[in-house]
């Protein structure tokens, strides 16, 4: 689960639709994921997913690796389901 309190202020003050899409993209990146896989899962174009992923990566929210992108661990909070 994403810890929204640790996200940058600019993301939290982004207009509603754009913010919702960015949160959805971040949720896809909780596990290693490529831009193409995230775009298919969210039913958006690869270019739109690339554009938002680029913004999120440039501000330091994502790690990049051979399997795609992943949300940095400090932005993920553990949820106890007991």
Regions found by a protein language model. Give the residues of each.
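Short alpha-helical segments that sit at the start of domains
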Residues: 1-23
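Short glycine/proline-centered loop/turn elements that form peptide/ligand docking sites
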Residues: 11-14, 31-34, 48-51
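Short acidic, hydrophobic short linear motifs in intrinsically disordered regions
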Residues: 29-41
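Short amphipathic alpha-helical interaction segments
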Residues: 44-57
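A short, conserved structural fragment
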Residues: 57-68
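Short, amphipathic alpha-helical interaction segments positioned at domain boundaries
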Residues: 76-82
């Amino acid at each position: 689960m994403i810890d929204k309190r640790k996200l940058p202020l600019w993301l939290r003050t982004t207009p509603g639709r754009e913010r919702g899409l960015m949160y959805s993209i971040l949720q896809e990146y909780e596990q290693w994921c490529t831009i193409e896989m995230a775009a298919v899962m969210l039913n958006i174009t690869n270019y739109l997913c690339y554009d938002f992923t680029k913004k999120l990566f440039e501000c330091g929210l994502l790690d990049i690796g051979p399997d795609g992108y992943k949300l940095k661990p400090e932005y993920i909070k553990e949820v106890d389901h007991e």
